[in-house]
Amino acid sequence: MSEKLRVGILGATGMVVQRFISLLENHPWFEVVTLAASPRSAGKTYEEAVGGRWKMDTPMPEAVKNIVVMNVNEVEKVASTVDFVFSAVDMSKDEIKAIEEEYAKTETPVVSNNSAHRWTPDVPMVVPEINPEHFDVIQYQKKRLGTTKGFIAVKPNCSIQSYAPVLTAWKEFEPYEVVATTYQAISGAGKTFKDWPEMEHNIIPYIGGEEEKSEKEPLRLWGKIEDGVIVPATEPVITCQCLRVPVLNGHTAAVFVKFRKKPTKEQLIEALRNFRGLPQELELPSAPKHFIQYLEEDNRPQVSEDVNYEHGMGVSVGRLREDTVYDYKFVGLSHNTVRGAAGGAVLCAETLKAKGYITKK
């Protein structure tokens, strides 16, 4: 066994977990040693537990096929085998909150893909290029939990990855009002067209809970730590509509922005191309070299051309132009199960390791 950190994944048979497993194959720092799921999957090998439901383009990694799935509710037992866990469990919000805290209290850091703790005041919700300083709130969370090493960190909703990084890159121009419509892939619901044939040739103009997340979560990313909790920003005000569209992977957003300090188009494009964050400075294993690309062509970004930009960890932007009602409008695209889910969580874990929050037990 190498000096890699031992990783457990909670919720082991779902689509996001499959993406975690694919991304962590041959990872230089992390090694998946434990998979935990519901009692009905426990005791089976991972290959048996998933059955014919492997949904990735690449085959199931050999290294995980014969891992015997543990019962996610046997917290002490699972925690004793790992240095930290990724959480992508399918339970009620209250159950997720409780089980993630139970894991943290065993001195096991939890990096969560779930929404349950996104508004817990002392839990950092982080996109590492945008707000890595929010990890500083962990010291206060540990006091509340009574832990020395255990804590919970979360990543935000997949829908905001196509525009929150862009607005962050434009912060100096003070965006204060934003209108967005997102066009979200079916893999965001954990589905493929085989599972959800009624989505072919169809658009559904509603995704439960998604609009509120899309409006509020960016403000938490841009917030500040005060008195041991994260206080969200109040601007820009965002209004959003979220549509489910017949695309397998990739969330697209059409966005309109007003600025207090109206820039030129050239200034906006330059800000996108120059935008770098901590993961780029630290050259973390999963970090895109260039987080945001700007495409000049009128017909880009396109899902078929651009969703895998920087292995799905980058954001593609195009069609930036002045608007008749707002100052500017643009289209953004990101990969919802890579940057928007498992890949974003892996990058959070890499950042936490680099900052000394996750270590060997």
Predicted feature descriptions by range:
Residues 2-205, 237, 315-316, 320-323, ...:
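N-terminal Rossmann-like NAD(P) cofactor-binding subdomain of oxidoreductases
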Residues 187-361:
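Charged docking surfaces used in two-component/phosphorelay signaling
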